[in-house]
């Protein structure tokens, strides 16, 4: 009797074995179903990371573009500043030359007047006249190097841009609008008239 009590019935053993197998199968199934889920979660994390990195890359590229634009604008500003500075220097230089020429013209006029009114027949005055003529020539040669040119339009056609008509006179065998006399020479500085020549102009005969 005692041995029969200790012996586990075969049916019970089989039942317990079935339960164990079912549990093991369920564990395997749960493990297999969890693996794709974990892989999916890992894949989603990778995609999120890639998206974040792409956004950071796009932001960095935009910052580079903006910085390049800033550099280009800065370079353009420097070029413009240099150009404006050069123009200002050039204008100041021209203005200084104009002021210098304006102050010098009366001196030239006085020397020319002294020569034209001098008695060239007087032998005692010849050395002085020659000295004044040399001084005038030297002065004109010097100012010519700085762009100051004489306007002396005798026998030329009247040009209202460079000449100022003081009077008109009919002269035989001379076509109208010709400069027949120059009362005062004019001057231009680097192509710009700073004083027109005062002239007498021919007109048609009545």
Swiss-Prot record:
One Pfam match, given by its short name, reads: GrpE
CDD domains given in the database record: GrpE
GO MF annotation terms = adenyl-nucleotide exchange factor activity; protein homodimerization activity; protein-folding chaperone binding; unfolded protein binding
The alphabetical list of record keywords is: Chaperone, Cytoplasm, Stress response
BP GO terms, sorted: protein folding
A single GO cellular-component term on record: cytosol
Q: Cite the PROSITE patterns for this sequence.
A: GRPE
Q: How does it assemble?
A: Homodimer.
Give the gene that encodes this protein: grpE
Gene3D superfamilies assigned to the protein according to its UniProt record, in alphabetical order: 3.90.20.20, Head domain of nucleotide exchange factor GrpE
Q: What family does this chain come from, according to its entry?
A: Belongs to the GrpE family.
**Superkingdom as given in the UniProt entry:** Bacteria
- Function in brief: Participates actively in the response to hyperosmotic and heat shock by preventing the aggregation of stress-denatured proteins, in association with DnaK and GrpE. It is the nucleotide exchange factor for DnaK and may function as a thermosensor. Unfolded proteins bind initially to DnaJ; upon interaction with the DnaJ-bound protein, DnaK hydrolyzes its bound ATP, resulting in the formation of a stable complex. GrpE releases ADP from DnaK; ATP binding to DnaK triggers the release of the substrate protein, thus completing the reaction cycle.
Question: Where does it mainly reside?
Answer: cytoplasm
Its annotated compartments are: Cytoplasm
Q: What is the originating organism of this protein?
A: Psychromonas ingrahamii (strain DSM 17664 / CCUG 51855 / 37)
Q: What is this protein called?
A: Protein GrpE
């Amino acid at each position: 009797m005692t041995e029969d009590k200790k012996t586990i019935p075969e049916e019970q053993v089989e039942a317990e074995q079935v339960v164990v197998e079912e549990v093991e199968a369920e564990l395997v199934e749960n493990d297999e179903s969890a693996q794709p889920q974990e892989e999916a979660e890992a894949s989603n994390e990778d995609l999120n990371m890639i998206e974040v990195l792409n956004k950071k890359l796009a932001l960095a590229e935009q910052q580079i573009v903006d910085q390049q634009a800033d550099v280009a604008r800065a370079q353009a500003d420097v070029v413009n500043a240099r150009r404006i500075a050069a123009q200002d220097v050039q204008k100041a230089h021209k203005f200084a030359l104009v002021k210098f020429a304006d102050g010098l013209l009366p001196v030239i006029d006085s020397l020319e007047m002294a020569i034209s009114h001098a008695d060239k027949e007087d032998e005692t005055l010849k050395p002085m006249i020659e000295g004044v003529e040399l001084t005038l020539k030297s002065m004109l040669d010097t100012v010519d190097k700085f762009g100051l040119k004489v306007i002396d339009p005798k026998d030329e056609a009247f040009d209202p841009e460079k000449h100022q008509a003081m009077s008109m006179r009919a002269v035989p065998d001379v076509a109208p609008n010709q400069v027949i006399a120059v009362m005062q020479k004019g001057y231009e500085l680097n192509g710009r008239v700073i004083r027109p020549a005062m002239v007498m102009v021919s007109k048609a005969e009545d």
